[in-house]
């Protein structure tokens, strides 16, 4: 089976590197994701296709761990899934952080609706509290597959050895792949926000307008 791993070159890069601290803050998730990719390719972590994910959870006893930020999960989520965000909104309003937030808003936030985030320092702790048995089967998922790769790397380092990774994240999920969905949006659209969200809505509505005008 060919495993489609998310490409790291789609991550937004800043046009100007302001200082070492700023550069390091954007590099950390990428390093973790590379480690997660190696775990997938080595077979230490199971790659699960969206079509088989529900069966893996229902029949094989996997716990579905959603690592998306809270605002993405509010839009759409799988009923009964465990939620521990890998990234949380950065509350710091210091000068350097405010500058980074402005850059983020101009290059990423307005278009995608993504907020300026930081690594959740309590991520591993919260997962261990919720799933203390490290022999448990855990299927890790995010919106597009990259953040869940970083989460897989962290959890493997914590001693979890029966990990799964949903290939491509919820973005690749089709209607019916998970029978019980909560929220106001489709799972595959929950990551999209900002201007992109409204353009997507327009594209979805255009075929309907075309049929009515005939």
Swiss-Prot record:
InterPro entries: Rhodanese-like_dom, Rhodanese-like_dom_sf, STR10. This is Rhodanese-like domain-containing protein 10. The lineage of its organism: Eukaryota, Viridiplantae, Streptophyta, Embryophyta, Tracheophyta. One of its GO terms (cellular component) is membrane. It comes from the Eukaryota. The active site is at residue 142. CDD domains: RHOD. The chain crosses the membrane at residues 190-206. It is a single-pass membrane protein. Gene3D superfamilies: Rhodanese-like domain (3.40.250.10). It is found in: Membrane. GO terms for biological process: response to cold. The gene is STR10. It comes from Arabidopsis thaliana.
């Amino acid at each position: 089976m060919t495993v489609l791993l998310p490409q790291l070159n789609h991550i937004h890069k800043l046009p100007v590197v302001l200082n070492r601290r700023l550069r390091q803050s954007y590099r950390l998730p990428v390093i973790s994701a590379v480690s997660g990719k190696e775990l997938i390719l080595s077979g230490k972590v199971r790659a699960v296709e969206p079509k088989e994910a529900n069966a893996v959870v229902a029949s094989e006893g996997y716990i579905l761990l959603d690592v998306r930020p809270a605002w993405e999960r509010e839009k759409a989520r799988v009923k009964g899934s465990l939620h521990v965000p890998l990234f949380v909104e950065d509350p710091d309003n210091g000068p350097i952080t405010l500058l980074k937030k402005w850059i983020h808003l101009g290059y990423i936030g307005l278009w995608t609706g993504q907020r300026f985030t930081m690594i959740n320092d309590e991520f591993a702790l919260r997962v261990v509290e919720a799933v203390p048995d490290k022999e448990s089967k855990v299927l890790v998922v995010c919106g597009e597959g990259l953040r869940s790769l970083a989460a897989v790397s962290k959890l493997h380092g914590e001693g979890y050895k029966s990990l799964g990774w949903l290939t491509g994240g919820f973005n690749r999920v089709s209607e019916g792949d998970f029978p019980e969905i909560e929220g106001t949006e489709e799972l595959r659209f929950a990551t999209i926000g900002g201007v992109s969200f409204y353009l997507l809505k327009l594209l979805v509505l255009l075929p309907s307008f075309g049929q009515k005008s005939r």
